[in-house]
Amino acid sequence: MGKIIGIDLGTTNSCLAIMDGKTAKVIENAEGHRTTPSVVAYTDSGEILVGQAAKRQAVTNPDNTFFAIKRLIGRKYDDKAVQEDIKKKVPYAVIKADNGDAWVATKEGKKMAPPQVSAEVLRKMKKTAEDYLGEPVTEAVITVPAYFNDSQRQATKDAGKIAGLEVKRIINEPTAAALAYGVDSKKGEQTVAVYDLGGGTFDISIIEIADVDGDNQIEVLSTNGDTFLGGEDFDLALMNYLIDEFKKEQGIDLHNDKLALQRVREAAEKAKVELSSAQQTDVNLPYITADATGPKHLNIKVTRAKFESLVSDLVMRSLEPCKKALEDAGLSKSDITEVLLVGGQTRMPLVQEKVKEFFGKEPRKDMNPDEAVAVGAAIQGGVLAGDVKDVLLLDVTPLSLGIETMGGVMTKLIERNTTIPTKKSQVFSTAEDNQPAVTIHVLQGEREMASANKSLGRFDLADIPPAPRGMPQIEVTFDIDANGILNVSAKDKATGKEQNIVIKSSSGLSEEDIEKMVQDAEANAEADKKFHDLVTARNTADNLIHSSRKAIQELGEKVTAAEKEKIEEACKELEAATKGDDKQAIEAKTKALEEAFAPIAQKAYAEQAQAAGAQGGAKAEEPKKEEDVVDADFEDVEDDKK
């Protein structure tokens, strides 16, 4: 059985960890970094870039560089959040798919589902793990924000499938961080608040860590959050300030210039990071734009105090979910023994200060906020594989689940913060006399009004025998698995007839869609391999051309004019072949040059051997002088003395 890897699929950055013996280890990517930007770019040549390579070219390719895709995953195009929060903040096209989902499109018109784009990041993680382990990797534990709904969880699972990974478990990010902390902690019973402010989402979880019969039991008491609050919003606040200041100075609005916008976005992110350790920074972007009077440069000084004033409302927004999580857990601030900070944005001093003020205690800073979640995912992978024995994880469902009943009301079957896996049944009846069928409308959310909650799906239970209203007994059962994914069934108790729905398609992708995307991903992998092989063939050819010409130069007159001409001709033909994309043609011309150069190589080798022989002969003559010979005693060492 292969390793089950742990992946933190983040909005801004992603991280990979595996179990190495009894400890979890973060694995560096091919570029030598422990985190990988969650950025995917499609180039004009058809190449797919992932991570740092994609991020580097974002300024020159804003329409085809996709970042913060996690904010779109599992969402409908008409969602208020998509229309107000995302479409206005990204340079790439967000479109409405045939099924109503929010998809993205390249400038060439290629349409893609968010799980398809996220799958490229997961594929890079999978490849990194395979390169490190030297064996195929097919199974993973992937983390999601605790406040992700059913659609978003299912869409994340779909992304894994498209990337060629069987997702063994979807685990909540704060829970994963607590797992990483809890496995290392030997302090006995603790109640921990995990404050997780990442690139795109915010979660707060109240978690109890206890020793139960020698097992480390990690039980989530409550969770809350905001799926539209994260580091991207902090970047955006600073970016808008820089653009407004530039407009005041120069009278030019950069909001409509995609290239300039991307440069300012990157500069804002860099300045934000610098202001976590420095009191002020200079944002300097020469030649940001131009008008009739000539080129314009952006040069603005930003102090930490100014930045904090721009984002203070964002930090305060994170405290309301903290209050709700404490209320749901039935605890007060004084009951919290430790506060863990997770997510890169928690490095900001203002965030640390406000968290300290709220909980009344210094948050722990000994965990790496970028890596803790991936480490926890790897530990959960170890638990599932049977490699980690003494850990028991009890997670919760973040939002209430129920069905629509008479009058457009949502009747909850499973309340939020219920420990999962769980199963709950309730009996309902018909609203009219002789009603032949009932529609079960499955909802997720906290509102009383059904239409205000998230619709997960509908199905019908038909062929109900004629009866007065209120007489038929329809038993509805909700069953949530350990991934937080829901199965719903309805049964007519009189006839035993049953109908069920696995809320699979709540991600918006059918099995056929996913299968097609898996095939596309495999085709891309094949294309990537062909591209890699072509580059290898070109490099081999370039090296051979260089070494052949160098040898001809060094041998000088020892090579005949005819031989020189033959080799130069072969070099030119090979150079011409390397400018094309035909690998076989390059290899054929490489072989032709090797054959043409072989006699010269033999001649050079023979000369070297002759020179070495002459030198060796001269040295062999020397010892005829009187030599100092040193006698040495030696002793046989028998086996039993070894």
Curated annotation (Swiss-Prot):
Q: Where are residues bearing Phosphothreonine located in the sequence? A: T201
Q: What biological function has been recorded for the protein in this entry?
A: Acts as a chaperone.
Q: Under the GO molecular function aspect, what terms does this record hold?
A: ATP binding; ATP-dependent protein folding chaperone; unfolded protein binding
Cystine links in this protein are none
Spans through the membrane: none
Against PANTHER family, the record matches this protein to: HEAT SHOCK PROTEIN 70KDA (PTHR19375)
Q: Where is the composition biased (Acidic residues)?
A: 628-642
Matching entries from HAMAP family are given as: DnaK
Q: Which residues are the signal sequence here? A: none
Q: What induces it?
A: By stress conditions e.g. heat shock.
In which domain of life is the source organism classified?
A: Bacteria
State the species of origin. Answer: Francisella tularensis subsp. mediasiatica (strain FSC147)
Q: Name one Pfam family in it.
A: HSP70
Question: What is the name of the protein in this document?
Answer: Chaperone protein DnaK
Q: Family membership, please give it.
A: Belongs to the heat shock protein 70 family.
Q: Where is this region: Disordered?
A: 609-642
Q: Name the UniProt key words of this record, in alphabetical order.
A: ATP-binding, Chaperone, Nucleotide-binding, Phosphoprotein, Stress response
